[in-house]
Amino acid sequence: MLSAEHRLRHKDDFTVALKNGARAGTRRLVLHWAVTDRAHPTRVGFVVSKAVGGSVVRHRTQRRLRHVAAGRLTTLPALGGLLVVRALPAAGTATSAELAVDVDRGLRRLGLVATGAGDG
């Protein structure tokens, strides 16, 4: 589970990551990464709009993404990072495994993890 100290909650932090950060897209997700000068743990936030689906689908998608992101925290820089994972409509029908592949692909494209084979 993503601990409270690693959750991105404030609008200003989302804005920094979305407007000023690097962006990498996949079929189901867009990842935004920004580094701030503040000494706080890397934090992760999620944007899952109504375009993804109804309330149940949106919350299920966000829970899946939160679980995937929690497992990837150790690969990210420890301090000062803001990662926003924005779900596209196709994320609503994706499995947890498919979302994990997309998160990994996005992190590779952002240069946050080592490049692997099959990155398209």
Swiss-Prot record:
GO cellular component: ribonuclease P complex
Molecular function per GO: 3'-tRNA processing endoribonuclease activity; ribonuclease P activity; tRNA binding
Entry protein name: Ribonuclease P protein component
Assigned EC number: 3.1.26.5
Function recorded in the entry: RNaseP catalyzes the removal of the 5'-leader sequence from pre-tRNA to produce the mature 5'-terminus. It can also cleave other RNA substrates such as 4.5S RNA. The protein component plays an auxiliary but essential role in vivo by binding to the 5'-leader sequence and broadening the substrate specificity of the ribozyme.
InterPro entries recorded: Ribosomal_Su5_D2-typ_SF, Ribsml_uS5_D2-typ_fold_subgr, RNase_P
Alphabetical UniProt keywords: Endonuclease, Hydrolase, Nuclease, RNA-binding, tRNA processing
Superkingdom of the source species: Bacteria
Subunit structure, as described in the record: Consists of a catalytic RNA component (M1 or rnpB) and a protein subunit.
Lineage: Bacteria, Bacillati, Actinomycetota, Actinomycetes, Kineosporiales
Any single biological process term in GO: tRNA 5'-leader removal
UniProt catalytic activity: Endonucleolytic cleavage of RNA, removing 5'-extranucleotides from tRNA precursor
Top EC group: hydrolase
NCBIfam families membership: rnpA
